[in-house]
């Protein structure tokens, strides 16, 4: 399964960062990035940035990462900000897992891979697939505002 890496870079970068989280959660439970926390911590912080909530008593800067931007948009307007799609995309997968539960999410993730295997998926197909698995409309509205 692939995607348009220029037009929807967040899809593969976010999925890869989420896959790193799954690996870390399974095999590296004591890893904390030299005091910077786990990927789960980073995903939770990203969600707080998106929603304006505090985490551990701290207020974080508002998230302005636009998942609809292409690589050309990032290059033109904010080359250094591109790296944020890794965490925002990964955080979206993480939040969907939290809402569905680990087992249901993994079953749906397997179906997602089977559905789009040997083809490509775009942001709208991603949204439609996952809206068929749960009520993510409010979550998606947060991530694409």
Task: Outline where the language-model segments fall.
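Flexible, active-site-adjacent loop/turn segments at secondary-structure boundaries
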Residues: 4, 8-9, 13, 65-69, ...
């Amino acid at each position: 399964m692939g995607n348009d890496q220029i037009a929807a870079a967040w899809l593969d970068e976010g999925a890869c960062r989420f896959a790193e989280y799954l690996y870390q959660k399974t095999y590296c439970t004591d890893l904390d990035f030299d005091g910077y926390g786990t990927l789960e911590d980073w995903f939770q912080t990203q969600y707080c940035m998106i929603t304006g909530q505090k985490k551990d008593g701290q207020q974080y800067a508002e998230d302005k990462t636009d998942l609809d931007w292409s690589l050309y948009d990032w290059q033109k307007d904010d080359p250094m900000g591109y790296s944020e799609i890794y965490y925002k995309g990964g955080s979206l997968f993480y939040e969907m897992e939290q809402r569905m539960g680990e087992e249901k999410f993994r079953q749906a993730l397997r179906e997602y891979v089977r559905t789009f295997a040997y083809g490509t998926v775009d942001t709208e197909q991603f949204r439609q697939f996952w809206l068929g698995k749960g009520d993510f409309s409010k979550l998606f509205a947060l991530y694409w505002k």
